Amino acid sequence: KQLLLDLALPAGGLNSIITSADAPLLQLLQALIAGQRYEPSLYLWGDVGVGKTHWLRASADSARAEGWQAYYIDAATQSLDDPLYEVANWLAIDNLHTLDDAGQFEFFALYNQQRQQGGVILSSGAVHCQQLPVRADIITRLQWGLQFPLSPLTEADTLAALKWHAHMRG
């Protein structure tokens, strides 16, 4: 009987992002991570399958590789109440549309703390921030930052992504 080895491949950071439609977002994230630009808040939104989670994980991986205290947090499955997040300067918080009352309180506190400390919060949700089922003060905070609707991959981008992942697997 052959046993499977659960060996995860490195995520690839922002190098794993294949996009033509969302190239301005990629360039902005690269500039933020390199310290060439500062934006305290970015909100990504779109339907299931447009890559929100991939964008957030890739940004956190790239930021961490460049010396940021960066964390990816899935608000659908993880609490935002972790002391590590208070010392972070890059938070990638996925699935804001799933925040319950306690999660909204924690997000609001983290958002204000990051802004005060000069950190970055990259967050995502299924809908535009004005349509999120969250408190009005959270919507206001998200509107202070940049907002990006993500586009589905084109056929050419999908092919390029498949080739990149095949190449990474060897």
Where are the model-predicted features located?
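Conserved nucleotide-sensing/catalytic segment adjacent to the nucleotide-binding pocket
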Residues: 82-125
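Conserved AAA+ ATPase "sensor/coupling" helix adjacent to the nucleotide-binding pocket
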Residues: 145, 160-170
